[in-house]
Amino acid sequence: MHLIFFFSYFLRRYLLLLCAILILRAPLAHSLIPPLTCVNTGTVESDVTGIRFDRCLDTDSLAKISLSTVMSKARVYTDVNVIRPKDYWDYESLNVQWGEQDDYEVVRKVGRGKYSEVFEGINMNNNEKCIIKILKPVKKKKIRREIKILQNLCGGPNIVKLLDVVRDQHSKTPSLIFEYVNSTDFKVLYPTLTDYDIRYYIYELLKALDFCHSQGIMHRDVKPHNVMIDHELRKLRLIDWGLAEFYHPGKEYNVRVASRYFKGPELLVDLQDYDYSLDMWSLGCMFAGMIFRKEPFFYGHDNQDQLVKIAKVLGTDELNAYLNKYQLELDTQLEALVGRHSRKPWSKFINADNRHLVSPEAIDYLDKLLRYDHQDRLTAKEAMAHPYFAQVRAAESSRMRTQ
């Protein structure tokens, strides 16, 4: 009994000492960080996050808590994946049901990306057109994630429909089979769009975004290339879910997502606990390009220059307020590149060529999307209720009444 007592006593003292050493050694991003306490039961509680741990943490874990002094969480759909069963979001456990590759035949190449080549194809069973996305060699985990997300979103408004998943018997190269959309290149289409067309298609895109967000999924690559529009049928589809990810509150994500011109400030300043609002920034960049006829709207030559281009429009005062709120710091080189800029009024972008597309409500809507602080941006549902879309909502209500 005495041996057990002394062993227990010294173990508790050792754990307390170890916690103290680890806290002192943990790299601090900022000077004002509340201390961690380790009680003598072996439980560690962070005053920063309120998280309790059943043991003393290693250096990396403590460093992460220290760096995340202001935890950011999504304003909406925060706990979708907390409430859902694990098999909804656990894509690593997905057992892929492979179809028959011989059921499909390639007709012509229609595009290529970093992770895939895209072809128009034919379903040999029913002679219907389809899109065949042949994936380049990537981690199986990434392929499973895209498939799982597409399966979860199947049937959602304006989400491209996954029809089948096949793979080559010899090379094992996987291909995703999608519904066919007769899309016009956005560089050709956008300059022809009327004011109402832009309102209509942005509203349709918001339907897709609100749906995927409501299902606990961030797209993370919203851009014109990934928004297919069949203008004749007035049909829109949000495609390419290869970078999409399940949202878990407090989780730190890779900031190397989205295409440069559409990257949110959170990615450019290395804020990792971002959320669905990233998609709303990308949408805002798209929208600005459409109404001002300036594509891309923020034209950075690299990631650092991208932040510079944003700062020259939104100003550096609000950028600094954003950094201070989340206790982030730019490295010295980037800080020097960004410099100091006053906010540029949206009216400075209006000219004779785009005046007919830029209304007061369009400017107000844009201003509520392109915010440094991701928590200040409109959510997709809030955006759909904006006065900018009043005409579109009225037309949709009228159409539904006559059906």
Swiss-Prot record:
Q: Where in the cell is it found?
A: Nucleus; Nucleus, Nucleolus
Provide the residue positions that the database annotates as binding ATP.
Answer: 110-118, 133
Q: What does it catalyze? A: L-seryl-[protein] + ATP = O-phospho-L-seryl-[protein] + ADP + H(+); L-threonyl-[protein] + ATP = O-phospho-L-threonyl-[protein] + ADP + H(+)
CDD domains to which the protein is assigned, alphabetical: STKc_CK2_alpha
Q: Which GO biological-process labels does this protein carry?
A: regulation of circadian rhythm
Q: In which tissues is it expressed?
A: Seems to be present in all plant organs. But seems to be more expressed than CKA1.
EC nos: 2.7.11.1
Q: Which family does it belong to?
A: Belongs to the protein kinase superfamily. Ser/Thr protein kinase family. CK2 subfamily.
Q: What does this protein do?
A: Casein kinases are operationally defined by their preferential utilization of acidic proteins such as caseins as substrates. The alpha chain contains the catalytic site. The tetrameric holoenzyme CK2, composed of two alpha and two beta subunits, phosphorylates the transcription factor PIF1 after an exposure to light, resulting in a proteasome-dependent degradation of PIF1 and promotion of photomorphogenesis. CK2 phosphorylates translation initiation factors. May participate in the regulation of the initiation of translation.
The name of this protein is Casein kinase II subunit alpha-2
Tell me the gene name: CKA2
